[in-house]
């Protein structure tokens, strides 16, 4: 889902009377999505200020499941699709109990990561749930107008005719954390193959310009930028950035299919390493069978060149 967003608000929730409107829209979504199968629902607000509703749904052939719908005022549309949060079939009492536990945990500072959810619950991370909102081109001049600290940011890249995204974590004040291969000293087949099977790499703390142009050449037309988000925001911006700093000391090997920049940014945001691009069978196959020529390698590695030249390029563009 690709949409265009406006300058960011200071909160993912509503303000004043807007809170009432958000709750009304959430309950309208419950009626539209579940109809008569909705047996019980409870509205709530997370410790991070995000409105949500938890729903007990009656299954067609018996039993119940628990689902969630959230609101994020920074997204368009800002009401999420419903997603299941129970780990299996339940009785109605079990569903109500899970809703009570989740309501309590979601209201606590710190909340939880998706890799360690409360007992009986699950929070899937998949392409069908991740929303990409296109950020106005003005973000290249004024990052803090359109982004918030801890945002997961995708930069559109074209590799040998295949569209990929280079991702990172916006750290505020025009700086980003992102995961890239170390510069290759040669263009040998062995060095090229390493990018696909495990190459030396590290998390770097870069200016916005260096992040955006880490894998593409500088041109008069800047690449498209997207903000990626899961329906449930489980970490504050500060927590996301701190986790990026933690991974800066931990990550050392890059594998385009199993440990790439998107795995890094997803783990920072949700606790679960996930690659938006590698869910595509076509892209996964392309990265598996595509001959790793120097063209591909140069697109996947951090260029071994004088980065100071970027400053003059940025000023002149």
Curated annotation (Swiss-Prot):
Q: In which tissues is it expressed?
A: Highly expressed in the cells of the spermatheca, the mouth, and the lining of the pharynx, the rectum, and the excretory canal. Also expressed in the pharyngeal intestinal junction cell.
Q: What is the effect of changing residue 178 to A?
A: Rescues the egg-laying defect of the egl-26 ku211 mutant
The impact of changing residue 150 to E is:
In ku228 and e1952; vulval morphology defects displaying a connection of gonad defective (Cog) phenotype where there is failure to make a proper connection between the vulval and uterine lumens
Q: Which PROSITE patterns match?
A: LRAT (PS51934)
The protein's name is: Egg-laying defective protein 26
What this protein is reported to do is described as: Putative acyltransferase. Plays a role in the morphogenesis of a vulval toroid cell, vulF, which is located where the vulva and the uterus connect. Not required for specifying vulval cell fate.
Question: In which organism is this protein found?
Answer: Caenorhabditis elegans
Question: What membrane topology does the annotation report for this chain?
Answer: Peripheral membrane protein
């Amino acid at each position: 889902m690709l949409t265009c967003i406006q300058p960011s608000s200071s909160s993912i929730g509503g303000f004043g009377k807007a809170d009432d409107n958000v709750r009304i829209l959430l309950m309208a979504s419950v009626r539209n999505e579940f109809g008569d199968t909705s047996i019980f629902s409870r509205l709530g607000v997370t410790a991070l200020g995000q409105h949500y509703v938890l729903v007990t749904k009656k299954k067609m052939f018996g039993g119940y499941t628990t689902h969630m719908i959230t609101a994020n005022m920074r997204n368009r549309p800002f009401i999420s699709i419903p997603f299941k949060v129970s780990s299996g079939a339940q009785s109605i009492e079990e569903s109500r109990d899970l809703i009570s536990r989740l309501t309590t945990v979601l209201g606590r500072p710190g909340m939880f990561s998706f890799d360690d959810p409360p007992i009986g619950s699950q929070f899937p991370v998949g392409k069908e749930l991740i929303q990409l909102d296109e950020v106005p081109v003005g973000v290249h001049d004024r990052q803090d107008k359109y982004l918030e600290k801890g945002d997961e940011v995708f930069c559109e890249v074209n590799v040998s005719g295949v569209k990929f995204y280079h991702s990172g974590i916006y750290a505020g004040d025009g700086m980003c954390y992102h995961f890239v291969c170390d510069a290759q000293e040669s263009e040998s087949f062995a060095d090229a193959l390493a990018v696909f099977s495990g190459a030396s790499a590290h998390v770097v703390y870069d200016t916005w310009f260096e992040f955006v142009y880490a894998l593409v050449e500088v041109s008069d037309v800047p690449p498209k930028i997207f903000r990626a988000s899961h329906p449930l925001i489980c970490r504050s911006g500060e927590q996301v950035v701190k986790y990026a700093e933690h991974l800066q000391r931990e990550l050392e090997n890059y594998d385009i299919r199993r440990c790439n920049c998107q795995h890094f940014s997803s783990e920072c945001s949700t606790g679960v390493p996930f690659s938006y691009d590698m869910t595509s069978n076509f892209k996964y196959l392309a990265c598996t069978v595509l001959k790793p020529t120097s063209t591909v390698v140069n697109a996947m590695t951090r260029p071994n060149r004088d980065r100071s030249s970027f400053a003059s390029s940025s000023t002149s563009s």
